Swiss-Prot record:
Binds to 23S rRNA. Forms part of two intersubunit bridges in the 70S ribosome. One of its GO terms (molecular function) is structural constituent of ribosome. GO terms for cellular component: cytosolic large ribosomal subunit. It comes from Hydrogenovibrio crunogenus (strain DSM 25203 / XCL-2) (Thiomicrospira crunogena). CDD domains: Ribosomal_uL14 (cd00337). This is Large ribosomal subunit protein uL14. Belongs to the universal ribosomal protein uL14 family. Pfam families: Ribosomal_L14. The keyword Lyase does not apply.
Amino acid sequence: MIQMQTVLDVADNSGARKVQCIKVLGGSKRRYASVGDVIKVAVKEAAPRGKVKKGDVFDAVVVRTAQGVRRPDGSKIKFDGNAAVILNTKLEPIGTRIFGPVTRELRNDKFMKIVSLAPEVL
């Protein structure tokens, strides 16, 4: 469960290390985002020679949450932390590699590029 001001790890090689959620997209009253939701983020920590700089604002898709995601069969998948993948204006990933596992729910939300780049899909 991601809300405004939540700090997330970045699960790609775009150059950002930490991002902060500044808006949950999808309606004016929407408070929380889960796996597969698109959020607006600001880069808080970045690598020296990355594609993004500290202070830049991007869209990002949430790929892992500590809250977890409930499956229709009743199982629940939780992660140790919250992570996102930074997207460009066309909602395509900026990075060329994805680090760590991602959930199968991303496949339903038209993020097949992220699913195909990920080392493990749970």
